[in-house]
Amino acid sequence: KSGKIEASQANTVADGLLTNLCEKTFSIIREQVKEILTVSDEEIIAAMRLVWERMKIIVEPSCAVPLAALMKNKEKFAGKRIGIILSGGNVDLDKIAMLFNIAGERNKN
């Protein structure tokens, strides 16, 4: 929002997205990107769980971010054809089980 690169100490389950921007990349984003959607870790985990429950595919948290954004902003994308690439070689099964359990407990409360 400030128009310049600012350092951030993000803490997220989507650790594959924790990268630094260089000035060249930032200038492309500033010129070409009209909107950036954000999602919470809980929304990411819900998207991961949906993919698992419906498709029996385990995806890494970073891969679930676009689906989480679609789920959060249904009205923005209603009636549109959307494609999402699912990937996920960076998956720790024990960690995913823990995330699903934590998310399940939060949804019960």
Give the ranges of each region predicted by the language model:
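PLP-dependent amino-acid enzyme catalytic core
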Residues: 1-109
